[in-house]
Amino acid sequence: MSTVQRLNEITANLGVLYAKLHQHHFYVKGQDFYKLHELFETQYNEVHEQFDEVAERILMIGGKPVSTLGEFLALASIKEAPYTTEKSGRQMVEETVADFELFRTQLEAAIHSDIDEVSQDLLMV
């Protein structure tokens, strides 16, 4: 798999993760509302920064970053989860942890693959 392909998979996962974190931010309720509302906002802002950096790296190496929701959903291993039933704050946190664990596994695989060193360094921060 080429560096651009690997980075596009990461971009897709960041796009889906960004949307899911926003969803949790919008819908969180209950006694932990303020704490979780702020946490999800912090996380989606950090994911947005990573998303932008990875897409810019793809452009720097002559590739085209995926940029549509359809492309994100087709390439991402993190799956969207429509908010059809109410979730507790705990369920949202558990879902977020599972998504980040899946994403970490993907990052580790990319770092240990044959992608270029600059891209590896970008993924390690």
Roles of regions detected by a PLM:
Residues 1-10, 89:
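Disorder-to-helix initiation segments
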Residues 2, 17-42, 104-122:
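Helix-loop segments that flank and shape redox-cofactor active sites
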Residues 29, 34-71:
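Conserved alpha-helical segments that form or flank metal/cofactor-binding pockets of metalloenzymes
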Residues 25, 72-76:
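Short, small-residue-rich loop/turn micro-motifs
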Residues 8, 12-15, 41, 45-52, ...:
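Generic structural signal for well-ordered, non-transmembrane alpha-helical segments
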Residues 2, 33, 45, 65, ...:
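Long, contiguous binding/interaction regions
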Residues 52, 56, 76-125:
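Acidic/histidine-rich alpha-helical segments that form the ligand environment
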